[in-house]
């Protein structure tokens, strides 16, 4: 992954700004926050960041892909203890990273997980990509209904069999794409209880919306440098940012901007 010049913005620093990402020639990332008058119609998203469990790379890539339509704030797990935290957001989002069953309890007590569940019951939305999709499952936040996020690489006829950064074929609303993948999940369960937006080549659901919960196994937010260093063999699959548009469309369907 790339190195970063600056530390991530705090929740308060992101309160009235839209963050713009600039990738330099060494594929290092710096954050440039521009004071912006936020439209009242923009939905408010709280994006969790705790590097490396929730990767800076993944979080900032989500900001880059979604900040045109959403007011995005960065938050830390301790802020879930604030009774007023959810009063100021429409979507809570969890990016990819290396978080797993061993690290999860270090950040999220049952009380914090229950607060997220109550937020959803009250009309809030959840967005999870890769690790964030795993965390929607029964071993973690337990917010999905009859759906289990499971490792795609262990599924029958999976096109990827090891955990590494690569691309894999998906069918996104009828269009074949080679999308960035790093040990993401398939969403296995009763398909009558969710809408499938995208599938892996073996037919397993890859991106779904169930009520106010949207989860994605691959990385449509992936920026150009993920396709270049160090995995240069996937350069030819760079999509010119088209997958960012797919992600934006997905989130707009999950939580419309107007």
Locate the predicted segments by residue.
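Extracellular ligand-binding/catalytic regions of CAZymes and related secreted enzymes
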Residues: 220-258
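N-terminal beta1-alpha1 cap of cysteine-dependent amidohydrolase-like domains
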Residues: 39-88
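Short glycine-rich, flexible loops that bind phosphorylated cofactors or substrates
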Residues: 100-102
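A structural signal for short, well-ordered beta-strand segments and their strand-loop junctions
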Residues: 48, 71-75, 127-129, 214-217
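Structural motif
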Residues: 91-97, 213-217
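Short, positively charged low-complexity motifs
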Residues: 2-18, 24-29
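A glycine-rich, often tryptophan-bearing local segment used as a flexible ligand/cofactor-contacting loop or short
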Residues: 104-172
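Catalytic beta-strand/loop cores that center a nucleophilic Ser/Cys/Thr
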Residues: 161-226
């Amino acid at each position: 992954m790339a190195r970063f010049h600056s530390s991530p913005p705090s929740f308060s620093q992101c309160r009235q700004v839209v963050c713009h990402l600039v990738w330099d020639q060494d594929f290092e990332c710096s954050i440039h926050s521009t004071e912006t008058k936020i439209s009242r119609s923009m939905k408010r998203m709280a994006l969790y960041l705790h590097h490396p469990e929730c990767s800076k790379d993944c979080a900032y890539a989500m900001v880059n892909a979604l900040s045109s339509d959403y007011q995005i704030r960065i938050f830390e797990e301790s802020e879930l203890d604030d009774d007023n935290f959810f009063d100021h957001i429409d979507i809570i989002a969890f990016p990819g990273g290396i978080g797993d069953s061993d690290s999860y309890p270090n950040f999220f007590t049952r009380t914090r997980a229950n607060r997220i569940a109550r937020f959803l019951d009250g009309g809030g939305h959840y967005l999870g990509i890769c690790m964030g999709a795993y965390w929607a499952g029964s071993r973690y936040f337990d917010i999905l209904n009859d759906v289990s996020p499971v490792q795609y690489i262990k599924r029958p006829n999976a096109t990827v069999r090891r955990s590494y950064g690569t691309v894999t074929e998906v069918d996104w609303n009828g269009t074949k794409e080679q999308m960035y993948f790093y040990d993401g999940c398939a969403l296995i369960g009763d398909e009558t209880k969710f809408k499938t937006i995208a599938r892996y080549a073996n037919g397993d659901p890859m991106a779904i919306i169930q009520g106010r919960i949207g989860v994605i196994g691959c990385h449509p937010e992936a920026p150009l440098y993920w396709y270049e260093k160090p995995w240069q063999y996937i350069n030819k699959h760079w999509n010119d940012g088209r997958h960012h548009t797919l992600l934006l469309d997905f989130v707009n369907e999950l939580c419309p901007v107007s």
